[in-house]
Amino acid sequence: YVRAINEGNYQAAAELEIARSSFDPFIEQKTSSRVSGYYDGTNLTQRFSNPFEDFNGSVYTEYRISDGDFPVYEADYETLSGGEASVGIAISLLKNRELDKRRTELANAGLATSQWQALATSLINDFVYKGVSEYVAWYESALQVNAVTELLNTATQRERALVTRVEKGDLANVVLTEFKANILQQRLLLAELKQKRDAHAQMLSFYWRSPKGDMLIVDEANPPKDINWPFWVGNGQLMTLRNALRNHPELDVMKLEQQVVNNKAALASNALLPKLDLKASVARDIGSGPSNLDGTETKVGLSFSYPLGNRKAKAEQAQLQSKQRELEHKLTSTEQAITQRFEQALVYWGQAKDIVALQSENAALAKTLSKVEKTRFDAGDSDMFVLNARAQNEIKARIKEIKAKVDLLKAELTLYKEAAMLHSLNN
């Protein structure tokens, strides 16, 4: 998935290079020859042109050579025996002077590259969030399986002791039956937790990859003692995350889109201007021939045009101005939505910390009560119903404690996700 996103960067870079190609120099050649009729003139023209961005300009050099006779209306084709060499420049003075379609496409191609980079950051941020979320979900299930397994092993050992007491006649058989029923409930719970753990492990293998991109098998039964959690949150991190909201990739994409529309709007305004182009050249013929072709020739030309009405440009300008206002409203709405999501995640994180403390205290208390109840039962001061209830409460409290701790990890992860900081940590 990440490799596919990176390919998008290469495609955006290629689009930028395509836009730059509008200013590539080029060579052209034209040949004309009269093959029949009274006149037998032949003309060859070669030109090298090099466009440049300023003033929609272009510089060129040209070489012409002709042979034979031309009619009067084609006298411009005539050159001396060695041909004519010239150099010239063409620029725009009004319309297309400050910008034109090529320069706008080049600017927007650069913005499109930046847009894709911002979008790729957002996509990778979401992808990392999904992968890490799947990891902590597996981690939670695996810890719960281990906790219930540990308590179940203790209960199984106690079952053996109860069997011995029943065989000796110290306890009624119904007491053992009640205890076995409680163990069966614990085994059913363990089976459900293992099913959940294995499902998350299977999903996690999609995100767990080798450096070559191959999926790796997760050891679902052995969670690490320390996952080296990189997304912890403190006061310093909160300040960093909050500041990162101003540079959120979703906002970058929209701001860059605004610049694209602004460029298009400027181009539409440019289309309303009259067209006034200047062309100047210096030419000199070489060799022998008519005297009127000898010497240096300088040419300066102006061309002017303006479409009456120009309804298309005016309509495009109005359309783009409306688009500018639309994007401004969307940007404000997106900024508010990003801030709201972050603040909501912040509230959840604060509550998650309090719940962890309470659930840890509750688990410790449930463990103590279960231990005390076992002592009372062995002394004959309690019955199996109360003992089983204490054991069930201990298991539930332990599971809730694990869930609360993992929920805190999820809350911290969500803060990084909403600030779009997972991508930077992944790098």
Question: What are the language-model segments listed below?
Answer:
Residues 1-30, 34, 40, 47:
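N-terminal cofactor/phosphate-binding cores enriched in small/glycine residues
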Residues 2-19, 123-148, 157, 164, ...:
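Amphipathic alpha-helical coiled-coil segments
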Residues 3-8, 20, 55-82, 94-119, ...:
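Sec/SRP-type N-terminal targeting helices
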Residues 30-91, 222-233, 266, 279-318, ...:
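Small/polar, glycine/serine/threonine/aspartate-rich low-complexity segments that form flexible
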Residues 170-172, 191-240, 383, 410-427:
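Short, solvent-exposed, mixed-charge loop/turn linkers that connect secondary-structure elements
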Residues 193, 249, 404:
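Metallo-beta-lactamase
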Residues 224-231, 236-252, 256-259, 267-281, ...:
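Long, K/E/R/D-enriched contiguous segments that form extended
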